[in-house]
């Protein structure tokens, strides 16, 4: 669990902002959203496969646009 020590004469809003930033970097909110509901193993595999396909399409489209300008 990330922790933030409030400095002397530091407003609470600044400490809260630092805490939120630390939590975001640690990926805590994304992890809790992911674990909020049970996901069947088949659904998890399906989601990961779809993400891989999407990643590959994005990667290949980037490569194609880079290759066009060979002048």
UniProtKB/Swiss-Prot annotation:
Residues 40-71 are annotated as: Disordered. PROSITE patterns: RIBOSOMAL_S21. The keyword Membrane does not apply. This is Small ribosomal subunit protein bS21. Pfam families: Ribosomal_S21. Signal peptide: none annotated. The keyword Ribosomal protein applies. Residues 45-71 have a biased composition (Basic residues). GO terms for cellular component: ribonucleoprotein complex; ribosome. It comes from the Bacteria. Keywords: Ribonucleoprotein, Ribosomal protein. Belongs to the bacterial ribosomal protein bS21 family. One of its GO terms (molecular function) is structural constituent of ribosome. GO terms for biological process: translation.
């Amino acid at each position: 669990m990330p922790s933030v020590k409030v400095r002397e004469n530091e407003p609470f809003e600044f400490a809260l902002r630092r805490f939120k930033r630390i939590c975001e970097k640690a990926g805590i909110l994304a992890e809790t959203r992911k674990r909020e509901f049970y996901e069947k193993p088949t659904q998890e595999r399906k989601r990961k496969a779809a993400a891989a396909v999407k990643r590959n399409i994005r990667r290949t489209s980037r490569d194609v646009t880079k290759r066009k300008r060979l002048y």
